[in-house]
Amino acid sequence: MDNIFGSVKGVFCLGATHIAERIDENGKPYNCTADDAAYSIFEFEGGVIAKFNSSWTTRVRRDDLLTLHVDGTKGSAVVGLRDCWTQHYGNTPKPVWNPDIPNPIDFREGWTKVPEQEDFDNAFKAQWELFLKHVVLDTPFPWNLMEGAKGVQLAELGLESWEKKTWIRIPNLK
């Protein structure tokens, strides 16, 4: 996320196990010990706020299974697994709230799909190829030990936020 939005300054995360009992491959029920949903809010340097929600129990009524929503003062973006939609500040509808009549605004209308400029390969494959080239040919590799440590730190602080039900500030690693 640092490479797209900037450094993460804070996080609130709530995880949940919405389906406590599952059925295994043999048709036998078992108690689930894994969370099946994560709801997170991130604050980035510069004031950008992003909401990442992921759930295996969602009945999808959005563009994709995973949706990342990022708001800024000049516009917003909604990103799925394949597509990105943006809405500039100037295209944002200005509704008047009136619960007595149907809403006349189609809020999806003012969004613009970001055009695909190139074909993308499988992301996991591409990262492995970059890593193997780094190991064999000593080519640059942007995801070093510090980047890994920042990822572990964010995951641990996300779990702490969930456990304490509170906003957590992210300290800088050195």
PLM ranges: what are they?
Residues 36:
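Short, small/polar residue-rich loop motifs at catalytic or cofactor-binding pockets
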Residues 128, 152-155:
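Short amphipathic alpha-helical/adjacent loop interface patches that line ligand
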Residues 2-6:
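Solvent-exposed polar/charged
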Residues 154-164:
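Short arginine-rich
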Residues 10, 15, 20-31, 39-46, ...:
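C-terminal glycine/acidic-rich active-site capping loop/insertion
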Residues 51-55:
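Conserved metal-binding segment of the jelly-roll/cupin
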